[in-house]
Amino acid sequence: MSTNRHASRAQSRQAALQVLYSVDVGRRAAELPSSEAIDEALASVAAHFELPDGAHAYARELSIGVARNREAIDRVLADHATNWRIERMAAVDRNVLRLAAFEMGWSGVPASVAIDEAVELARRFGADPSPAFVNGVLDAVARTLEARGEGRGESGLP
């Protein structure tokens, strides 16, 4: 992957995290964000940060994908986040985990790439313990997907 594409993808992930965080903290817990809410949040993010060509589309794809599959993603994360309920996690950590789990399970992104990018987002936006927490949970998810022969977008998370 070229450096420009990597930078664009990294910026897309950052924008998607900001969108997911925004719609997560601005809604009731049981309410799934709509495509319209995601588009509004993405427009707000794009108004404040310059996104390179293609980054906006990938950020939207990630945000919509996480929103549409949030319940399944949250079940998988809950199974792998020992002693942590999803709703009790820090909002940044919760959405970094959702984003990476979606990439591993539905987008065909290799687990190692999704985990590395998620740890970097946690380092940048989370609290001091966030990178280690995110790495541990996602490593467990990746091992489960690998054991099932999944994780390259063929079947998604259960």
Task: Walk through the language-model features, giving the residues of each.
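N-terminal interaction/assembly modules
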Residues: M1-P158
